[in-house]
């Protein structure tokens, strides 16, 4: 009986060590990819890259993220792919940031969006890590919500309704927040063991929250 208890304790200890390792590697890689994206965004701003590059970079990064990254995530090549994906997203983001900086209150809008994104992520990450809850029950809600958002985005291309833009941006922030809780909860509870895929998921959530905050702040801070 005592040997069984010792064995169970040993297994639990190893599981905790593995979870902590995945969490640590995820945060380190996430920090590195965010920093690399910032450098690429700055580079594209200095180069004066046109805004059309945003769509091209988004499409290219989606193709890499959906079809290449999952196949390389368990090897060293996965690190190269994740930096390529996040670098593309950062490069495409540069013209968007330049557009907002051109506003009369552009620096304030961009700074507030950055700060808001950091507060949201750190708050959600802290809660998921301390509560150790399993947030997988939110998966259905997130999937349906994403489909609704996609339909709304397509519809608003033609409708051009500011109120719909506000609703879409707010909805995306909520959905991405839920995805952050789900992803970190999965790591903490041992459901996610690949730190490269975990980094990709968290990066996309942070990226979309930042873009959505920019849109909201740009709308409400507009002088029009």
Name each region found by the language model.
Residues 1-224:
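A hydrophobic alpha-helical transmembrane-helix feature that marks the membrane cores
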């Amino acid at each position: 009986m005592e040997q069984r208890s010792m064995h169970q304790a040993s297994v639990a200890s190893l599981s905790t060590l593995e979870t902590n390792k995945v969490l640590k590697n995820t945060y380190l890689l996430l920090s590195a990819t965010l920093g690399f994206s910032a450098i690429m965004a700055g580079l594209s701003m200095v180069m004066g890259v046109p805004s059309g590059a945003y769509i091209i970079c988004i499409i290219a990064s989606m193709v890499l993220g959906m079809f290449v990254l999952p196949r390389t995530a368990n090897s060293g090549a996965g690190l190269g792919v994740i930096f390529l994906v996040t670098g593309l997203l950062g490069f495409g983001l540069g013209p968007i940031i330049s557009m907002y900086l051109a506003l009369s209150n552009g620096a304030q809008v961009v700074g507030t969006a950055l700060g808001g994104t950091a507060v949201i992520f750190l708050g959600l990450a802290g809660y998921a890590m301390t509560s150790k809850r399993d947030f997988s029950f939110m998966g259905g809600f997130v999937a349906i919500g994403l489909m609704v958002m996609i339909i709304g985005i397509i519809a608003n291309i033609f409708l051009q309704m500011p109120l719909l833009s506000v609703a879409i941006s707010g909805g995306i922030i909520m959905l991405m927040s839920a995805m952050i809780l789900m992803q970190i909860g999965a790591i903490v509870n041992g459901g996610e063991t690949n730190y490269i895929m975990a980094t990709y998921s968290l990066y996309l959530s942070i990226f979309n929250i930042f873009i959505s905050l920019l849109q909201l702040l740009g709308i409400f801070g507009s002088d029009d």
